[in-house]
Curated annotation (Swiss-Prot):
Source organism, top-level taxon: Eukaryota
UniProt-annotated location(s): Nucleus; Chromosome; Chromosome, Centromere
UniProt-recorded name of the protein: Condensin-2 complex subunit kle-2
Encoding gene, per UniProt annotation: kle-2
Reported function: Regulatory subunit of the condensin II complex, a complex that seems to play a role in prophase chromosome condensation and in chromosome segregation in mitosis and in meiosis.
Amino acid sequence: MTRNAPPGQESTDLAWLVTPAKDLVENFSIDVLKALAGYLEVIRQESEDTDNQVDAATTYRLFDFQRACRIIQGSCAVYGRKVDHVYELTISVVDLVENKGQDDGNTGSRRGAGRRKNFNLGSTNYDLADIDSLKQEALANFEKTVKEEKKSIDAVRMVENAEVIESQYERKSCLVAKPTQFMFKLNYGQLNRTDEQILNAKSRPDVIGKVKDFEIKKSKVKHDQQILYSHDCYRGNLDQFTLPGARWMPDNKELAANFGVADLEVELDLEQEHEKISAYGPFKDPLSGREVVPPPRWFIEQEAVRQNQEIQSRATSRAITIAAKTLRDSQGFGSQPTRLSQPFVERHRQSNHLNDFLSFVEGRVNKNRPSTHLTTGLVDMFVDNFGSVMQNDEPNTSRRPDENYAPMDFDDDFGGGGDDDDDDYIRNLSRRDEKRAPAPWDELDKNHIIWYTGDENLPVVSKPVKKITKFQPKPAEMLARKQRREEKINKSRRDEFMETHDYLQDYYYWRSAARINPIKDWKIESLRTAILAEKKRRIKEKTAKIREARIQNMQRKRTARVIPVEQFEPVTEDIPTSNRRTLGAEYDDVVDEDLAAEVELSMFGGGFDDDEEDVRPRGERPPMAPNNLEFDALQTDFDIPPAEYVPLRFEDIDDAELNSVINLPGNLLIDKALPLLKKFAENRTDREQMAYEMAKAYEDVDVAVSTLQEHVDKWHSRMEPILEEGETRKEYDVHAVGRAVIGQYDIEGGTKRLLDLVMDRPWYEISRYFLSCLFMCNVGNVMVSEDMELPLEERINSMKITLLKRDMHCEMFKEAGALDA
């Protein structure tokens, strides 16, 4: 600011210069850069014209627009902040230039459209704010703010969790209103329609229970409304399980009582065992005898919270005032389309009125099920008692509403909402599928991204990264670890043999199918053909018995002319009667479908014993005399003795059949198995022989252990000392062995035989010395020579090593630090 106020002419000139800036008050959408560029050009031009005329002491410096324009053009990130600051400073300058000295009272008298707007900009300090200091202060308080936010979030969560837990563990007592037509008739005390099914509201309805699933406890019947009020929890009203739609929040006592454990039994168990019985089961249902496992606690809590939210959503979406609806009676008469009411209604009791209704069976009820509809009573009661009051708010009614009556909210699901397709109920339920908005405390947990302009001087801390290197263990150590793990496992001799046997079958003989399909076992395959042959023989024998019995019991039409049995039987055998149920499909051994079912059942051993006769023929009825035309009494049946049953013996099986079915992995087991089968098959049946062979194969160690096990044991005894001795050897270092070889020479240029160098050395170090000599020969430390005239097998004995120099390359590299780099 200047020391003296400018004169009037100069004030007018300055006001003309800042006219575009004054327009920012009315229209901020102008091009600020273009306007500031115009300011800069005008100031430059006037400064050049008046530079030599105006004294420096009388120069009025209001604002450096050139500096402001450069700041805006140089920093695009802070463009908006700078423009706002320039705008505020410009407006304050205009107010000071035009309004200064007019505070003598004349300003207050100027009213109307010509009055200038006053801007309260606060302080007239035009110094730019120190952004760096503000940022440093904000960064210093950032951690403190974050901690306070976390504490507040934790406090909110604790309060909410406490409220949720308190609501969960609160003993809920719900009032259920049930139509009396499902319970008791008024004229006689007998259950009515107890087997009617209750369906849910899916597109394909599922049965969720029957009427008889409900028990009435602590109930009161109101005959005028035909509704039964039950002041009890849902679990007391349900017989065994909670049906879908019921809102039940159990505690430990209810869990123990509702899943088959009575309170008396709990007390007796507590007195005897002095321990608390878990309320989460499993328990045994005393009615059905089956084991009932209740859901886990976390599932019960989750379902309780979800059901509570669902109740609120349903109550909000379905609470529609009656002003826009028309209630119809229970018989379906009225202007609205036909809409049947729902079978069950649950409600909360407030004062003595039915204020709201929630459907017990969730979803829309199928209207084609008249067995579960309220035919009389409930809706008529609503129309008679509340219909006229609820219609007071309609615009066309002249009756004044009751002042002492509050309009109620209820489920207007009876009229259908005026839609022809009657889908208003489903449309209102669509709100349950909407996604809930996230809670405010969930948003606070997210890490918000802080935007920086690039001008901040943020402290940067760099920490060294710890490099973790994991080396591969040595082969000897890996082998030792494996042996230590295997030593801890206690295995029997048979398990070790089977592991070796499976390994050879999979990797040596390529017989992995034996492990994939355990059914293909030699113990079963060896008896498969014999078992099938015996089954076929029994089927044929039983089929013959059944046919014989049916022929004997065949009822013949008694006429004046009776055909003798000797003439009738050959005809029936040549032309069998086809079965109408098989539609012409004949069986090989069986003619009738019932006979085929019996034979098939006998093949699987279903309900038939070997030593029991399945069919006992009643005997043949001889024909009556030709001269007797009347029906006489039936003659006494006579029994035919059953045929003797001969069980299958393995001695009947020939050697060729046994050799064709037995497939064993070795000749030794075949040689042992065949005599064994013949030896014990003389006095045993097929089942006894199968049981003996199965037990023998698993229990007799002498049969299971073969020459393969002996070879494996010998191989183990020979290889284990070698492997153990190999683990005790030192690691091979080519440079260390090379130094030992050079150390045996006294002077450079000396020559020694390889046999002299390895004298008194272990046998495994001979190859190490030889490889070290070859390595030093490549780097120029020694020279290897041999007698070329000798044969190839004897040249190794004549090999000579000559020392050329003692300095090794590895030591030179180590001194220079090349190996470490």
